[in-house]
Amino acid sequence: MVIEFLTFDVDPAERETWLQIEERHWSRFLEQQDGFVSKQMWQSADDETKIHAVIWWESMEQWKAIPQEALDAVVEAMGPHEKEPSMKVYNLLRDG
């Protein structure tokens, strides 16, 4: 199990619109990928401009097997709403 932890800077005035567009493009795309488990969107408790995407994958290999061309197509579909996140990756050591 691997967790992809992305942090986006999103203007609070644009948050709801951005979340809807992000869900329409990125969430629907990810749901179709082999190895995708789950995705949640979190707002930082101490900074309302920070939105965190927590994405669970069955394995790093499945996550990294997504073709770059497919990722590029989603970026293009997001248009001006695409945001470059900071990213961290976590590997599961123990469950429970």
Language-model features: where?
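Short amphipathic alpha-helical segments
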Residues: 14-37, 70-75
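Short, well-ordered beta-strand segments in beta-rich or mixed alpha/beta enzyme
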Residues: 2-9, 38-68
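Glycine-rich beta-strand-turn "strand-cap" elements at beta-sheet edges
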Residues: 2, 38-49, 74-96
